[in-house]
């Protein structure tokens, strides 16, 4: 029979690392700490180099720490990153999500980022190149050489993705990754190209979304995954491998697409993966490299608050694809991972359902991440490993974030 209110609130007699206080998903103050201590210190994927292929192409990026960033390719073909804010009066410089500054804009001349407010202008490297009537108004007190944009640390790598880090003292991208992408290094050796982009806004915490990529116990929710994976040899042998920094890899397997009605047998592979093989790496705090030959998907989670997350989905193929190969990759990607695909909507629904149910902590005094299966595919070690790193950075115990719960007996 159903439990009483007192029984419902009773804390399970489990080790503390197997229990999570749901308030870490719902507390606005904890989210502000995450912005400062996690997102402002992490390397994050802002876009892919193929999304800004020509000199003077730009993209803007909504950084999870609350910053707006401009990414622009300069005349030397180098991608630069700067805060999207004018040093004069703090106005937003670029409003469009993407485009080019090669031609003139309503605010100013070509090859310039020009503020529409007072026409201060900057080049693609972030240097201030013009202040209208500077001498008349500022005399010698203000000089354009002192008023460049605020640069943001940026690296391009690991498949041509553009990574940014707000921390000027951050370790290199390679150090920060801690070897986590080396396991799929062979899949990132050839130039890639984005052929698909869509986004979803979910009423839930960003960690809820990352949880869906950090455990596969929820494969029961996916008809597609049950048919092509769970019912075949090799599925239960997959393992989680953890890396320093909160990152994790799921070992690859051969998917049986021929078991799914309407799906022809895969004949097109991916560098480092035979047709139909699947590899996945989760990066802390919200990036997932997900490759099911013949296509690749990259997820990036951008929290919009403690209870809302924007997830970007990119589908990628090889830059060297023939038109026929690209068509195969697009069809495969969109039929599985597109907005109406056979795999993705269930994950969105899972996160949305958690966001609804956990909005009132009295309705869920705790949640479990207690599956221990020797790091095999249904072990929840990926979630626990994520929160171990989370605890190191935020300084709160996920099972007792306010230090007011007695610990379970060891």
Task: Give a label for each model feature.
Residues 1-3, 16-17, 410:
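Non-catalytic, topology-defining segments of multipass membrane proteins
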Residues 41-46, 51-54, 133-138, 279-285:
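Short Pro/Gly-enriched beta-strand edge/turn motifs at strand-loop
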Residues 39-43, 91, 218:
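Generic structural signal for secondary-structure transition and capping sites
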Residues 78, 84, 153-410:
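C-terminal catalytic domain of Rieske-type non-heme iron oxygenases
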Residues 20, 24-70:
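Non-catalytic accessory segments flanking enzyme active sites
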Residues 1-2, 25-28, 34, 116-122, ...:
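Short low-complexity stretches enriched in small and charged residues
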Residues 51-168, 174-178:
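Rieske [2Fe-2S] iron-sulfur-binding domain
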Residues 7-22:
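Short, contiguous pre-domain boundary segments
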């Amino acid at each position: 029979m159903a439990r009483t209110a007192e029984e419902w609130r009773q804390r399970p007699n489990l080790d503390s690392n197997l229990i999570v206080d749901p308030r870490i998903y719902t507390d606005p103050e904890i989210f502000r700490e995450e912005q400062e201590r996690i997102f402002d210190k992490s390397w994050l994927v802002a876009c892919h180099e193929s999304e800004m292929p020509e000199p003077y192409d730009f993209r803007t990026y909504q950084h999870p720490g609350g910053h707006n960033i401009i990414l622009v390719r300069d005349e030397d073909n180098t991608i630069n990153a700067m805060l999207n804010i004018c040093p004069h009066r703090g106005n937003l410089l670029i409003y469009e999500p993407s485009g080019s500054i090669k031609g003139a804009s309503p605010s100013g001349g070509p090859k310039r980022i020009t503020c529409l407010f007072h026409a201060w202008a900057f080049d693609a490297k972030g240097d201030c190149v013009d202040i209208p009537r500077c001498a008349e108004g500022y005399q010698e007190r203000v000089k354009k050489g002192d008023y460049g944009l605020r640069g943001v640390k940026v690296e391009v790598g690991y498949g041509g993705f553009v990574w940014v880090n707000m921390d000027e003292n951050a370790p290199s991208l390679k150090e920060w990754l801690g070897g986590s992408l080396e396991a799929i290094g062979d899949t990132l050796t050839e130039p890639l190209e984005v052929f698909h982009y869509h986004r979803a806004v979910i009423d839930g915490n960003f960690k809820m979304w990352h949880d869906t990529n950090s455990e596969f116990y929820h494969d029961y929710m996916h008809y597609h995954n049950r048919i092509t994976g769970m019912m075949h040899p090799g599925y239960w042998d997959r393992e989680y491998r953890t890396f320093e920094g909160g990152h994790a890899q799921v070992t690859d397997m051969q998917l049986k697409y021929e078991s799914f009605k309407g799906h022809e047998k895969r004949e097109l592979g991916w560098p480092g993966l035979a047709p139909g093989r699947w590899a996945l790496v989760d990066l802390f705090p919200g990036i997932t490299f997900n490759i099911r030959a013949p296509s690749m998907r990259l997820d990036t989670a951008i929290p919009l608050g403690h209870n809302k997350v924007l997830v970007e989905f990119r589908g990628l193929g090889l830059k060297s694809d023939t038109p026929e190969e690209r068509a195969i990759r697009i069809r495969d990607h969109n039929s599985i991972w597109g907005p109406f695909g056979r795999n993705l909507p269930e994950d969105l629904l899972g996160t949305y359902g958690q966001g609804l149910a956990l909005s009132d902590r009295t309705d869920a005094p705790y949640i479990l991440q207690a599956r221990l299966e020797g790091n095999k595919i249904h072990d929840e070690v990926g979630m626990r490993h994520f929160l171990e790193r989370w605890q190191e950075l935020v300084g709160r115990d996920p099972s007792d974030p306010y230090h007011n719960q007695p610990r379970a007996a060891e």
